[in-house]
Amino acid sequence: MIYIAHRGNIRGPNKEFENRVEYIQSALEQGYECEIDVWFDDQRGWLLGHDYPQYPIDFKFLLTENLWLHCKNDRALYQLSKHTKTK
């Protein structure tokens, strides 16, 4: 069975911490997979946040094992598609 921490939450909603890198990493370290909300902005780059882009991140973070990426805008989906390997 796979347990997925929604936005890093493992004990119910916590809007103060969800989608923050440290919170997500803590859930991963405890054995959970994590769904995260990903945005891309042409000026600000990659960001996490549910209702709006809040927390800047490096693209390499998105390559972390056991993350489920929820693209929150079309730019995020487009940018991710440029990094997808196809056969």
Q: Where are these predicted regions, by residue range?
A:
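Phosphate-group recognition and catalysis centered on beta-loop-alpha active-site segments
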Residues: 1-87
